[in-house]
Amino acid sequence: MHYDTITLTLKDDIAVITLNRPHVMNALNTQMRAEITQAVTQSGKDARVVVLTGEGKAFCSGQDLGDRQSVANLDLERTLRDEYEPMLNAIINCPVPTITALNGPAAGAGANLALAADVVIGAKSSYLMQAFSKIGLI
């Protein structure tokens, strides 16, 4: 399977899913959420463990707010229900252990993505930030 926003490697029964939009600190867009969901679901069948990490200096900066067209047309309820919930549930319900290798900041939805795994291992440069907790988005 070919992915545009992530990479998936499988070696020695270890699936490594790498968020691969480093130019936007691996910000989540609709395509990336769908690809993560699909890759985790498939890896749960093919691997004995799934590792999530990010390319570049960040794990994930959260929702891609730089794509003005997508943000202008964003239906938050639909996006949470139809995109974020399936992505997070794929990780939470994965039949094999899931590990987040936190290589830098994980903010907002990126922090939630990181914390959905069974185990989170962070580099010294990593941190989690809940950017929208004051409006109930955690």
Task: Annotate the PLM regions.
Residues 46, 54-90, 106, 134:
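Glycine- (often His-adjacent) and acidic-residue-rich active-site loop
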Residues 17, 52, 64, 113-115:
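Hydrophobic/aromatic residues within transmembrane alpha-helices
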Residues 1-55, 89:
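Conserved CoA-thioester-binding segment of acyl-CoA-metabolizing enzymes
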Residues 32-36, 83, 113:
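Hydrophobic alpha-helical membrane-association signature
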Residues 87, 91-93, 101, 107-138:
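CoA-thioester-processing core
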